């Protein structure tokens, strides 16, 4: 009998599922529709991946497909009402199995359904008759609970225990050793961190496991699990936990620092009082200093004026002695009489002073009130390193070993574990960052570390009350306001949450989660969604199918909160909310700088579109996440490895983007080192400021403004320029090549560093006000960035104040192409003066604008030296490797041969260190090619894919050998470069890697060249000998999108609407206009390469199958290709507004 397993249904299963359902149920299922609307869809496959079963669950009452007669639907609603609880009950909408595999397929489907949804307790199914004879696999677990005579419908029920028999768990005995040992040995490979025997058991000696079992006491416990008459797992626990180190490393205040609540409150109040006292003393000291300063000022004023006022009257001349005192007394009597006659002014003044004093004291007390962050920091300072005053409220799991077939049931250990520790509230597990997560971690809460923590492990927590199975979801009501206010009390945005819930509850767009009747979570939804805005900025078609999901089925999450104890119920709450509100997709928009909600990890991030509409009204400045019916219970596997990406270059950003958007893995510890911040810009940049905002880096990536100054490969530790350190498990070097002028001159005179900027810094920060106050600006270097800098300075009004110099012989090849095109187009370009910048030093300013002096030398006559006063120097030399980074890498013994050498998987000679972008080159085994000639985003994406493949190995599979030879990377996308030019022109050069290695205006050998000159500018396209686009050049007054034009490079000319024949016939007057006509929009779509690969695969399959007619034409392929293109256009209709769909293809 073949091995049958069940998994979530994939899009590629749709045709096979529809055929199976048609055969088994004699009905049409429309699996595509069910994928978007069902609660959970599972497919059973045999060991040949043949579909042999399909199960679709729903959370509304329904009859099973192919069952039930007239009146059955109404009867089901009534009969199942008392048994159905949203969040823990589901209906079987479709269950179809191959006849010969019914028992095995049914068992696999039902078991997977319950294990996939931990909250699911009961399945209900309405069949058209008895199951016993027709479907014995279902009959074995479903019990009949009702029937409807008129329709012939029968209601069946299956509980979790009937499908997934609970494990028999008991304390371990010494004689269990022989059964426990094989499980331990298997887990030493799959999960070594949880299969590590304690040192006290002498793990290197025989029978160490026996000693662990024999050493049980009230603090150390061992439990074993049995199923089907055999031992299938064991767990080792201890209540001897160092909570002090955990409190110093992790934010545990939501869990009372694992102390009894009354002890935590005492410590909290003590710390609060301490902070209040310190702040009050400081504020009073400041107030006293201010009073003294005011008094000194008043005294000076009294000495200068004719009337000393009150303070002058109180002063006594020391020479007066007793006479002076008597005089004062006499004056006082007279004054008293006058005051009496004048009314009650004196007493009133005293009262006012008292009131002012009380008010000032109240203001001091209010200002001294500690914040929660200050109190927590003080708690750490006061109690760190001290023994806890009471037993902590937790126990720790130190070992967990399970048979793979029962690993998903490991959570069943927790109930007897808490029973063994009756006084404990929390169970914790720590895992090294590079360890895989077993299934149990999916039900636990990952605790956030404190900023700057170097603790080498990840902490997971589970609360005793999270085991309560009574969890339900219903619509929110106005009467829930008090419970909501209690739930969110103490949160910074508590008032906003309450206000949002109040409005949403009144409108019927709020849902609440209840545990034993107590409100533990809530969500409010905005039923209106701007789909046009979302489609214009994000790849929405990868997550939802608007053809099947109309506008009213989309909503946006406004507010969300859940008691930390129940965070493992996020999916249940959101999925139930969707059903209650009739939605198939819920979105969450996260603006930059906003704290992400806890439930973000159950949402899927929607990829930002890099090529968006130019309409500013359709520009989104937020990251978008989505929760769909199709992916409601699709869990991405967590990766806790600390991945550090060095450099916010296009390659580095592409690595981060690919990891964030991976559909199968969730990377929880990403760090990006971006010295000076993330700087993007330029017409050829593939990451605009809008794309960065839509990536939402702040939500899931730690951004550090620091450079690497030290690398310890042995400890996997980086020293940073800000004095901090950071550990890594995988390090990605993507700093790229940079202009080194700043570093070279700053070594001689550190003060000049502030005068040197790069072209990106100039474009981002230089203003017209700067142009007005500066008198002399030097652009140094002849890289392409120099011309962009000149254009920026010209546009800001500083063109006349700019001098352009460069060392002779420094012209890069692409600049030569630029000048050649400019000559053809009749465009005058500035040429640099041949000068060397011999020195740059800060001088004492004669005027406010003079900052430094630049020493220029003419290489043809090096004797005379010109001293040029400069206010700003723009470094535009050909980029090279940072000297400090090179020193760091060289000291770490990484192989460097002009560039950092990598293999086909982008690994350096250290398998934990990867490199890409212009910093790296392939090893000689792969031709030694410099990666700077390739598309940086493509390189970064491929590098990230190499990381993903490393983490994708299964728990029983060894991860890919670090020394294994990887195939060469498949890099095909063109690289586009370009810049704005002085005079209002623009230049673009896009080419394949071969074209970038040897840039030229001519076609390659055996190729073909096309050129047009029009009022829009000069456009040149070259084809190689195979008819593919080799390079594309443009110089003119149109600000074209360089990466967009680059997407045409590598395509055969046949894709370009018969480009070559039309050009030869003289029908094309302007190449730029022709390749940007509406017909070309499909070619520019970011998903078009995937469509092209699909078409090529189908064509190759047809050829391999001998699918040819007598005249050599492809059989059926053309029809399949047309269908694929129409389906692509339908799914991406919002991104292709210029395309009109045939009526037959719209559904």
Curated annotation (Swiss-Prot):
Biased composition regions of type Gly residues, renumbered to the chain: 296-311, 335-345
GO cellular-component term (any): motile cilium
| One Pfam assignment | CFAP61_N
- Give the region (Disordered) as residue ranges: 282-362
Entries under InterPro entries matching the protein: Acyl_CoA_acyltransferase (IPR016181), CFAP61 (IPR038884), CFAP61_dimer (IPR056299), CFAP61_N (IPR032151), FAD/NAD-bd_sf (IPR036188)
User: Is Cytoplasm given among the entry's keywords?
Assistant: yes
Localization per Swiss-Prot or TrEMBL: Cytoplasm, Cytoskeleton, Flagellum axoneme
- The keyword Cytoplasm is annotated on this UniProt entry: yes
Q: Where is the composition biased (Acidic residues)?
A: 319-334
Q: Gene3D superfamilies recorded for this chain?
A: 3.40.630.30, FAD/NAD(P)-binding domain
Keywords for this protein: Cell projection, Cilium, Cytoplasm, Cytoskeleton, Flagellum
Quaternary structure and interacting proteins, as annotated: Identified in a spoke-associated complex containing CFAP61, CFAP91 and CFAP251; the complex is associated with the radial spokes in the axoneme. The complex associates with Calmodulin; the association is calcium sensitive.
Q: What does this protein do?
A: As component of a spoke-associated complex, regulates flagellar dynein activity by mediating regulatory signals between the radial spokes and dynein arms.
Q: What is this protein called?
A: Cilia- and flagella-associated protein 61
